[in-house]
Amino acid sequence: MKKQLSFPQGFWWGAASSGPQTEGQFDKAHENVMDYWFRTAPEAFFNGVGPDVASDFYHTYPEDFRLMKEIGFNSFRTSIQWSRLIKDFETGEADPKAVEFYNAVIEEAKKNDIELVLNLHHFDLPVELLQQYGGWESKHVVDLFVKFAKTAFEYFGDKIHYWTTFNEPMVIPEAGYLYAFHYPNLKGKGKEAVQVIYNLNLASAKVIQLYHSLGLDGEIGIILNLTPAYPRSDAPEDLAASQFTDDFFNRVFLNPAVKGTFPETLVKRLEEDGVLWSHTEEELQLIRENTVDFLGVNYYHPKRVQAQSNPEEYKTPWMPDQYFKEYEWPERRMNPYRGWEIFPKAIYDIAMIVKEEYGNIPWFISENGMGVENEGRFIGENGVIDDVYRIEFYEEHLTWLHKAIEEGSNCFGYHTWTAFDCWSWNNAYKNRYGFISVDLETQKRTIKSSGRWYRNVSNNNGFEVEVEE
């Protein structure tokens, strides 16, 4: 028997992307950290493919918006590149070519009846600010980010209703300072990572304060990657590992963003360990008073944790790993290409946490996706990639999201990652995520089976599922 799962009126159907992963480096005055990393170490990138052209959104955006409309998008998120928009980082002076480009993108979205969400930071710190000031370890960089935001709001604030400060800010300390998978590729820098976490929270609050002070008729939020930390067992030591992991990787951004305060248990632990961030009472007050209007949640996979069997190994230098250790759940279902567990129920668990512990703030799924390698082998006789695995992935996640909405979750949209295949940092184009395939040699776009499926979902504001009678 089939049942129609219908979503709330006005529900967002669309996808997310970012400037550094799609635009290419055309007409940019500055390099971001990813541009620099590729230029200095191209061998670190899959097949030696960098961000110089990427998906060529800088030139193809009119076609891309037309295709997005064709597959049912009513909304789309991308980002403004700090290294593109700003000519002089110290003054916040804009580059006229960048202003012209982003205005054209905004106009094209409007022409196609697509609500454009603009994000201000997607792992793309200008490399000069890392080299001169130490990047996000520096509060001067926080202030320069506010100047960048001010310029963006002055040029585009009256044209864009939905803004976000950061995409997945936790990835910056995690990838750049703790585990070395994004530039500057540092490892074991726990104390520095803790300061970066604080400074990013401060930067977000300062930009929110600025936005509201300008009297703009819109809303501003943040995009967080929430990865529920499921304990291996109900043993006290596993539960403690789960709580620490949740505090350190999720709530250290979620709490300040929505409640204006940091998790007390985490602050106490960091203080006891002598690694608490440098802060002032004035800064904490500013964070308290400038919370988000809405929340975006990126969900890909859960964390599964247990007590750390060898905590001493992670105490000098300080690392969060002394309090938890990941483990492989025997019943896990994996995406073998990306190495991530597929666990759709977590999207429901996140929704219930936001509802019950965070005032049921308006929120949306801002990314959810499945990256698959060598998708060319799934091309059918019609020349279309028949990505039924992606359709099944989305249907499972949407079914759990629908259940959460039925139970009162204030979720207003579902964005996938991503609209068209894009450059994924040092994985480049290894795993493809899009509804629309991109031929890197010709930049030709072709809608996949999942794109046609998504059009039907959007047109019907829902989809049918099989249920037992």
PLM region spans:
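Active-site region of glycoside hydrolase catalytic domains
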Residues: K2-F45, F89-E90, V99-E469
